[in-house]
């Protein structure tokens, strides 16, 4: 058993409470490798932001659970080395699908886990979430539950439809499970292809495809039922057009990739939404930089020469999200 506190990590409880009061959201950036982690930590330190290092089940398998634990510990030390005396870094399991997966993560040093039972019948979701909460809280690990289904594909998470969260269920769910935060569905979607062209329309001013608006009325109803309770948005990448254009310019084939407009995420961040998940944007930034380097320097074969620019491009993206979308800059306790 490895306790996350021995790794220098924190859970989400205090940072979420501060975020709700302060009207901002904590960035939850998914990562799969060292370059992504370095970029996340550098961006968080330079903007003085708390941050959630988010790992899917697939990413944990890819990185190896033991190596991942030391990477998280290293992230804390790296932040201190960069000048942050008291970093606030969470290691969070994204979309845990079984009790066993969540337990394994808790036992290996995760400070927060998500149990996603949203695909199950309601009572089964309640029972599974409560089982994870009961175990996690013994070790002061925070738990995120989910109500409602997001469409899209990302790692092992896949659904061809979305179901908005039913506000009438949230009080019962939060009370019976004891979860610390709740992921809801209000129209966000996983992956880079969040909406079909048929679901979107062209903005005459910019000529860009615009997705349907988020269902803020559902969010408002949830906030009314659970005042002050931490809410989470998944599938919140904006799919930056410049990154998509770079990928396509240098041999990619990303057609009709549409994300969530940043102005909608800004609006959500000022509400009880205190955690916003971003994964696809990082993948796009990394891929765009690598493709550009390969095209401009076809003789290059030193991984540092293409992963370095990718890391820099991701850091730029993370800083932008913190400063201009989420508002979590300068929010560290000390």
What residues fall within each predicted segment?
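A short N-terminal beta->alpha junction/helix N-cap motif
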Residues: 3, 24-32, 59-60, 305, ...
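Alpha/beta enzyme core
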Residues: 10-21, 34-59, 66-86, 95-230, ...
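Short catalytic-loop micro-motif centered on adjacent basic/acidic residues
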Residues: 26-30, 91-92, 114, 231-233, ...
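Short acidic/histidine-rich active-site segments
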Residues: 235-238, 258, 278-282
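Extended, intrinsically disordered, low-complexity segments
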Residues: 289-334
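Shared catalytic-loop signature of beta/alpha-barrel
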Residues: 53, 60-64, 265, 274-298, ...
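Generic N-terminal amphipathic, Lys/Arg-enriched alpha-helix
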Residues: 1-27, 300-301
């Amino acid at each position: 058993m490895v306790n996350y506190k021995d790794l220098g990590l924190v859970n989400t409880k205090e940072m979420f409470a501060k975020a709700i009061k302060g009207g901002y959201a904590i960035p939850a950036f998914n990562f799969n490798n060292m370059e992504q982690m370095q970029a996340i930590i550098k961006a968080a330190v330079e903007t003085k932001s708390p941050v959630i290092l988010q790992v899917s089940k697939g990413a944990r398998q890819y990185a190896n659970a033991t190596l991942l634990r030391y990477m998280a510990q290293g992230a804390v030390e790296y932040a201190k080395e960069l000048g942050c005396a008291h970093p606030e870094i969470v290691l969070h399991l994204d979309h845990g699908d079984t009790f066993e997966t969540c337990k394994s993560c808790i036992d290996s040093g995760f400070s927060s886990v998500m149990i996603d039972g949203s695909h199950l019948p309601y009572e089964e979701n309640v029972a599974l979430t409560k089982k994870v909460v009961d175990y996690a809280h013994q070790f002061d690990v925070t738990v995120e539950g989910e109500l409602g289904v997001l469409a899209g594909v990302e790692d092992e998470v896949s659904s061809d439809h979305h179901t908005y969260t039913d506000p009438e269920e949230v009080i019962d769910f939060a009370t019976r499970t004891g979860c610390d935060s709740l992921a809801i569905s209000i129209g966000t979607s996983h992956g880079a292809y969040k909406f079909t062209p048929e679901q979107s329309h062209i903005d005459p001013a910019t000529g860009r495809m615009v997705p349907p608006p988020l269902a803020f009325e559902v969010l408002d109803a949830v906030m009314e039922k659970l005042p002050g309770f931490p809410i989470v948005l998944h599938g919140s990448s904006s799919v930056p057009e410049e990154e998509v254009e770079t990928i396509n310019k240098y041999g990619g084939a990303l057609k009709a990739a549409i994300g969530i407009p940043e102005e909608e995420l800004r609006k959500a961040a000022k509400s009880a939404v205190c955690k916003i998940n971003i994964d696809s944007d990082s993948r796009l930034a990394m891929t765009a930089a690598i493709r550009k380097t390969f095209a401009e320097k076809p003789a290059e074969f030193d991984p540092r020469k293409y992963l370095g620019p990718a890391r820099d491009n991701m850091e730029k993206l993370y800083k932008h999200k913190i400063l201009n979308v989420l508002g979590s800059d300068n929010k560290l306790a000390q």
